[in-house]
């Protein structure tokens, strides 16, 4: 039975990034995911500057571009008063464009890079229990593969990077230290035949929308509102709800979207209120949505996941270099919470859908300021520690 330094549960953005960084640093890592490799996920796809910065530092941005992911060089904001504000993406922190890769491509890219770094990848394998030692410290996981065979994966550290419905967080009973009140109900679809000019975000009459250019010449379009309003509109069908919310969010976007060619059926998501969980303990940690989730209306989830993966990897390298593990992991949580606090609060207010134009513009400026702090922190991290072996067992 192989024993690992770290077992990472979850093979999406948070888990793939965590496994990749620790594998490159020289740790013995197992990555476990219940899904098949390369499966898609409901997502807004949009990476913000911090996420693109990390891809560049990790040497993966060229792969995203080579896959045909279009460069995003502007962002437009449409408001309920009929105004539109267009902002060019200025070259900053080595980033001159943003990207929104499809999840079947991006998640697979991260996991493949992790495997190239020496990570053992177990797909179609679901965690069923945690392993503990006599002191109560978590010591890996017990899982079941698709054939029903039990797989034992002992490890010094177990990471839950398995999303909103995290098995690891549930088994640990990780405490919630901050709870949101609001949630978006969202409809997503892909269309072709529309060349969106960069990211398009709309904040209209109690409804939001976004147009996000992605791979294969497609554009991801989402509309969102409160769950109560969505339920009322969906009584008349998903198409009716989609079009009505698009009109309420941004009337000028209606015609180009509804006359485009659908590339996939409409998919819905009922939403989950945001939360912040304690993200570490004896032998365990949480990364990404497993530990911290905010409403998707501000389209920052993938960037959150990559950021927290790197913060956690830095903490683990500090611990292997001699810093007490509890101190290193407490620092990880403190930095995560500092960088997330303003994003969480502003997103919570946007997800109430009770904004005026002036109010939502103020909230979006707060989001932008918090994203600037995030970029500044990531720029200060050392590339060397996460691109060359630095792990000491």
For each feature predicted by the language model, list its residue ranges.
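Beta1/beta-strand and adjacent pyrophosphate-binding region of the FAD-binding site
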Residues: 1-14
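Glycine-rich FAD pyrophosphate-binding loop
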Residues: 9, 23-43
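Conserved Rossmann-like nucleotide-cofactor binding loop
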Residues: 14, 37, 165
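N-terminal FAD cofactor-binding segment of flavoenzymes
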Residues: 42-80
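Short beta-strand to alpha-helix junction loop
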Residues: 92-112, 189, 233-237
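Predominantly flavin-linked oxidoreductase catalytic cores and closely associated redox partners
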Residues: 113-252
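FAD/FMN-dependent oxidoreductases across multiple families
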Residues: 234-315, 319, 324-326
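C-terminal helical "tail/cap" subdomain of flavin- and related membrane-associated enzymes
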Residues: 259, 314-393
């Amino acid at each position: 039975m192989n024993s690992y330094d770290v077992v990472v549960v979850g093979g999406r953005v948070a888990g793939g990034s965590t496994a990749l960084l620790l594998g490159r640093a020289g740790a013995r890592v197992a990555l476990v995911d219940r899904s098949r490799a390369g499966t898609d996920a409901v997502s807004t796809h949009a990476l913000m500057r911090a996420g693109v910065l990390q891809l560049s530092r990790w040497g993966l941005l060229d792969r995203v571009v080579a896959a045909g992911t279009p460069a995003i060089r502007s962002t437009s904001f449409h408001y309920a008063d009929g105004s539109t504000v267009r902002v060019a993406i200025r070259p900053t922190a080595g980033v001159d464009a943003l990207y929104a890769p499809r999840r079947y491509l991006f998640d697979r890219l991260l996991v493949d890079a992790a495997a190239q770094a020496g990570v053992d990848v177990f797909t179609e394998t679901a965690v069923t229990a945690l392993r503990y030692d006599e002191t109560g410290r978590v010591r890996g996981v017990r899982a079941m593969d698709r054939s029903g065979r039990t797989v034992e994966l002992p490890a010094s550290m177990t990471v839950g990077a398995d999303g909103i419905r995290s098995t690891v967080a549930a088994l640990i009973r990780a405490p919630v230290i901050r709870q949101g009140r609001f949630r978006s109900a969202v409809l997503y679809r892909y269309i072709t035949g529309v060349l969106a000019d960069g990211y398009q975000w709309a904040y209209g009459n109690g409804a939001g929308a976004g147009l996000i250019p992605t791979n294969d010449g497609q554009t991801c379009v989402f509309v969102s509102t409160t769950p109560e309003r969505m339920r009322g509109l969906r009584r008349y069908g998903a198409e009716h709800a989609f079009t009505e919310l698009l009109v309420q969010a941004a009337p000028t976007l209606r015609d180009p979207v509804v006359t485009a060619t659908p590339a996939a059926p409409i998919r819905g998501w009922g939403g989950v209120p945001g939360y912040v969980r304690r993200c570490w303990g004896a032998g365990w940690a949480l990364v990404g949505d497993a530990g911290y989730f905010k409403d998707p209306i501000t389209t920052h989830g993938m960037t959150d996941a990559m950021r927290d993966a790197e913060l956690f990897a830095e903490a683990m390298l500090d611990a292997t270099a001699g810093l007490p593990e509890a101190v290193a992991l407490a620092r990880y949580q403190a930095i995560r919470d500092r960088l997330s606090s303003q994003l969480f609060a502003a997103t919570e207010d946007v997800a109430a859908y009770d904004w005026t134009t002036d109010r939502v513009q103020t909230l979006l400026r707060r989001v932008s300021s918090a994203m600037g702090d995030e970029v500044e922190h990531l720029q200060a991290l050392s590339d060397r520690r996460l691109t060359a072996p630095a792990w000491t067992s």
